[in-house]
A protein has these predicted regions:
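Noncatalytic modules at the cell exterior or secretory-pathway interfaces
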Residues: 52-59, 95, 102-119
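Bacterial Sec-dependent N-terminal signal peptides
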Residues: 1-24
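Short, surface-exposed beta-strand/strand-loop-strand elements in extracellular ectodomains
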Residues: 63-85, 121-131
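Solvent-exposed serine/threonine-rich low-complexity stretches and specific carbohydrate-binding patches
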Residues: 32-34, 82-90
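Exposed aromatic-hydrophobic patches
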Residues: 43-48, 94-102
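Transition segment at domain starts
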Residues: 20-48
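Charged, low-complexity intrinsically disordered segments
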Residues: 35-39, 90, 117, 129-132
Length: 132
């Protein structure tokens, strides 16, 4: 009887350990980075199908501050989605996690519209991260 109880408890524990990952535990991948210019500017990061399917995006800013106005995500099926950020990012800061609509999506490219009035003469670097 004890052996049956042990195997039942072990099976229940094993079943609970195979649950899906939470949003914070899903793997993130660096999709690209751009050094920003001074004043109002536009950049894009190309992402290929080889990078995989994504459920979310996040921006990280390094070296210098950046005022990010918006990003436009172009998907593999031709659709595009615009996300207004309107946020001043300090060096070392990051955006909120931007959840992509629908299920996992193929991303072709991401366009950025930003400006910077960097008085410290350090150009900021914007990194684009994708969540699988």
């Amino acid at each position: 009887m004890k052996i049956k109880l042990f195997f039942a408890a072990f099976a229940a524990l094993a079943a609970m350990s195979f649950t899906t990952l939470s949003n914070n535990a899903r793997p993130w991948e660096l999709l690209g980075a751009r050094k920003v210019n001074y004043a109002l500017d536009h950049d894009e990061i190309l992402v290929t199908r080889a990078e995989g399917l994504f459920t979310g995006l996040q921006l990280k800013v390094k070296r210098g501050p950046v005022n990010m106005h918006r990003i436009v995500v172009h998907f593999g099926n031709g659709e595009k989605e615009e996300f207004e950020l309107r946020e001043n990012f300090r060096a070392g800061s990051e955006s909120r996690v931007i959840d992509l609509p629908g299920n996992k999506r193929v991303i072709k490219k991401v366009d950025f519209l930003y400006d910077t009035k960097n008085l410290a003469n350090r150009k900021g670097v914007v990194e684009l991260w994708g969540r699988h």
